[in-house]
Structure formats: C-alpha cells, structure tokens
C-alpha cells in the first residue's frame, strides 16, 4: 500500500501542477486516518464509497452495493468515517436507493449519487453516458439524453464516402 508521504506528495502535485481543486479518494474507514491527515494539511478531499471504479474488478464487477444488511452497515460505517475524517462531500456510487436515502439524512457532508437513486443531495452522470458517446452502451441507471455516438459515426461515414467518391470541395 502507498505510504502516507507518497499519498501526500501525489495529492500536492495534483493540486499544484494539475490545478485540481480537491482530491477524490475511493474507499472508506481503511483510508480515514490518511484522509484526516491530508485534510489537516489543507487539501480538500471528496470521499467515494459503494462501487469504486479503480478497484471494480476486485469488488466483483458492476453491481449494486448495500442490498444485504451487513453491506449496508459497512457503507454506513464508511460514510461516518469519511465524514469524521473531514471529507467535504461523499460520492455514493451504485448504492441501493434505500441505503443512499438513509445515509443522505444521517451525514452532514453532501452525499452525491451516481446510480444511487434520486434522494441524494446531488447527482453525477458521466458526460459521455449522458450524451450517448460510449461504444459499449451505458450502465443500467443511465438515461442517455442524446445519441451523439451514432450521429458522429454517421457523419464520419458520410465524410469517408465523400473522400472515396472524390466529392470533397475545394475553395
């Protein structure tokens, strides 16, 4: 596992060189001590629990979290740990709606949902999913508001036809 000094150096570098306004950290109570130290240095931290994109394969792939009582309790413990560590907000990804709703009412930092139902304090949706730009389709909780991927493919196809048919225009 990464040492705290390396964690701090990486976070500072993201802030200074990358121009980040905050650092997102995926995980719960296991990282709370390091998050608390990071916050104490003045670095704002956004927590992230539930589905963790960086470790999705190890967690059994894309699925809902919190459907069994032990897992719901674990998510609650993680959220409280992140709140106590000083996270300014917490992302709840792919969490059972009932669990996310309860959590949003129990913690002070805003709970920002992604695939966790409508009752979180805020919502995130990946722009590529919203615009229909993904090649592999979108997660089940996503409503694509456009289908730009098909439009782009169609436009590129027409362009290729024009090039091959020598129909491109000169000035």
What are these regions (language model features)?
Residues 1-171:
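Alpha/beta enzyme core
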């Amino acid at each position: 596992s990464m040492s705290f000094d390396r964690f701090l150096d990486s976070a500072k570098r993201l802030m200074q060189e990358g121009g980040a306004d905050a650092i997102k950290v995926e995980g719960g109570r296991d990282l709370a001590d390091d998050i608390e130290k990071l916050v104490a240095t003045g670095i704002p931290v956004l927590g992230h629990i539930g589905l963790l994109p960086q470790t999705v394969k190890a967690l059994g792939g894309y699925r809902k979290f919190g459907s069994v009582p032990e897992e719901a309790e674990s998510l609650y413990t993680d959220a409280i740990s992140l709140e106590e560590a000083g996270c300014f907000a917490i992302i709840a990804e792919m969490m059972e709606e009932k669990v996310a709703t309860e959590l949003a009412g129990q913690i002070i930092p805003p709970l920002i949902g992604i695939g966790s139902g409508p009752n979180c304090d805020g919502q995130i949706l990946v722009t590529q999913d919203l615009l229909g730009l993904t090649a592999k389709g979108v997660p089940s909780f996503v409503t694509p508001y456009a289908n730009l991927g098909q439009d782009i493919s169609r436009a590129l196809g027409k362009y290729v036809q024009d090039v091959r048919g020598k129909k491109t225009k000169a000035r």
